[in-house]
């Protein structure tokens, strides 16, 4: 369960110079609802060698886990199986480009019917999808990139819809595209 308070705390702790491991430990010990077992956290510090840390609470719904690597922390719960996380990791690592390019490719790794096991009957990967990238001095309501497909209808694939929005966003950033 997402908590805006916990997210703000994590951001403030990162700004104060704590390591990803220290931030995760703080969040577990100081959960806003005193129930970290229902949470998943991932923290990456791309400015200090790509350090990463994660936590998956025991009361998150199965399949649940996380994968860590340099410059990434991948978390998932209510997943069809472990392969979803592996696909996400492979897409992230095998994509050349900006952080946003790598994140969008990672999301495509979960573009499998039932990746969120609640959506198998719909034939979609999930109910919604979003991508958010912030630069160091972005304001909370004005990120470099903040795209969201929320609760799609008619069995539309949210990751494909998000990919379309992302492609439009890319074209707005560089209207000439690749030359």
PLM features: what roles do these ranges have?
Residues 1-179:
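N-terminal nucleophile
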């Amino acid at each position: 369960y997402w908590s805006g308070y916990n997210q703000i705390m994590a951001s403030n702790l990162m700004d104060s110079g704590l390591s990803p491991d220290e931030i995760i430990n703080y969040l577990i010990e100081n959960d806003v609802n005193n129930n970290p077992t229902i949470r998943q956290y991932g923290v990456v510090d791309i400015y200090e060698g790509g350090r990463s840390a994660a936590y998956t609470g025991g009361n998150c719904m199965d399949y649940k886990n996380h994968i860590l690597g340099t410059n990434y922390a991948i978390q998932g719960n209510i997943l069809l199986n472990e392969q979803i996380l592996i696909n996400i990791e492979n897409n992230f690592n095998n994509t050349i480009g900006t952080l946003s390019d790598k994140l969008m490719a990672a999301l495509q790794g979960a573009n499998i019917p039932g990746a969120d096991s609640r959506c198998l009957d719909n034939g979609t990967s999930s109910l919604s999808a979003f991508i958010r990238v912030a630069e160091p001095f972005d304001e909370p309501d004005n990120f470099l990139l903040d795209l969201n497909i929320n609760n799609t209808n008619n069995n539309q694939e949210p990751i494909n819809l998000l990919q379309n929005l992302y492609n439009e966003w890319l074209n707005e950033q560089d209207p000439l595209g690749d030359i």
